[in-house]
Amino acid sequence: MTTTDANTSRQNEENTEQIMENTAIDTQNITNIDNTAQLDSQSESIIEVRHLGKIFGTHEVLKDIDFDVQKGDVTCIIGSSGSGKSTLLRCINLFETPTVGEIYFHGEDVTKTKSAPKYREKVTMVFQSFNLFNNLSVLANCTIGPRKVLKMKKDEANAVAMKYLELVGMSAYINAKPRQLSGGQKQRVAIARALAMSPEVILFDEPTSALDPEMVGEVLEVMKELAEAGLTMIVVTHEMTFARDVANKVVFMDGGVIVEEGAPEQIFTSPKEERTKAFLSRMLAEKQNA
């Protein structure tokens, strides 16, 4: 470790107590998320998925997927590993090209767009593996998008990044590199980076799956506060408590299809489909045996 890194590490350790206090998000600040993320009094469909299918080689991963996301929705997608959840999210973000079907964003079929990067400015993604630039500082990770894509000036991009780093309790770590952060801290930086692009929708692909158990709560708390602020979110998750308490719609997938969807209370207390019941029973058993 270089002298500079050692000094930064010592400084970060000295700030740990302060950061833990800052992790509880300032409710006043969070209500200032850009208006595009606020919940309208009347619901408006932002994303409509119609007859979506995806085939890799001879394997049909997604089959005839249909669902809508309205402004302010928190949609949690649950299901066993390999059920197609993450592939669906990657199709919605156009990281994967659907084999068939349409994805409408404000009524426009984005599967036919020639400007996927422009679309991703409004529908951005937080990955399970963070995907931070290891050679850049925390602040630079959060300003590179606004500066390169949104063409913000340096001072403006810094101000936007600091706003959201403060929001997620990471403003004291702006000079740190990702290797100096815990998994939970990296994911909070990734969330701040996504927010800095002023998106209308954030897609979360199992954002806690790569974290140690003690780090999960801090990330879920940030996401809960964002949901309460009216940010539209689609979350692939194995965190059933989060899905039950925070989502307003839960989608259960199995074998590449949507088996059942509905309000959390209906899905978790009186699911209609046997496959849904079996999955939830397995999840409950795993939690009890953990």
Regions found by a protein language model. Give the residues of each.
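ABC-family P-loop ATPase nucleotide-binding domain
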Residues: 1-53, 288-290
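C-terminal boundary and immediately downstream tail of ABC-type ATPase nucleotide-binding domains
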Residues: 22, 265-290
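ABC family nucleotide-binding domain
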Residues: 42-264
